[in-house]
From Swiss-Prot:
Protein name stated in the entry: U13-lycotoxin-Ls1a
Record keyword Disulfide bond present: yes
UniProt keyword terms in alphabetical order: Disulfide bond, Knottin, Secreted, Signal, Toxin
Species: Lycosa singoriensis
GO cellular component, one term: extracellular region
UniProt note: domains: The presence of a 'disulfide through disulfide kOR' structurally defines this protein as a knottin.
């Protein structure tokens, strides 16, 4: 049974390689026509636009202070004092600090966690 399985595997591998070579040689001989994109004319007129710099940084991106981070509860976490700073998750207190300190990217509301509230 094992020998039969090995023989079938070898035959299948040979078949796959030979059919791939046929397609490659037919394409090189221009026997197969390349597929044409129907919408290529639509996108040809559009010029790629340069990405504009965002006013705030997403999580994991470089920052200088808490006001650079996009999320309300995001804080600017720095390694070795002021080096290698990036935006990370903060907490409710971070949001309150940003509300009082930041002029740009100022939080409108600060989300509170439901974990500490008593039920009943």
């Amino acid at each position: 049974m094992k020998i039969l399985f090995v023989l079938i595997s070898i035959l299948y591998a040979v078949y796959c390689f030979s059919s791939e070579e046929d397609v490659d040689s037919a394409y090189l001989a221009n026997e197969l026509e390349p597929v044409e994109d129907i919408n290529s004319e639509q996108y040809a007129a559009l010029e790629p636009k340069e990405e504009q710099e965002r006013s705030c940084a997403d999580m994991g991106q470089d920052c200088k202070d808490d006001c650079d981070c996009c999320l309300n509860i995001a804080t600017c976490n720095c390694w070795f004092g002021r080096y290698f700073c990036s935006c990370t998750f903060g907490d409710y207190q971070t949001c309150l600090r940003k509300k009082g300190k930041c002029k740009r990217n100022r939080p409108q509301s600060c989300p509170r966690s439901n974990l500490n509230r008593k039920k009943g």
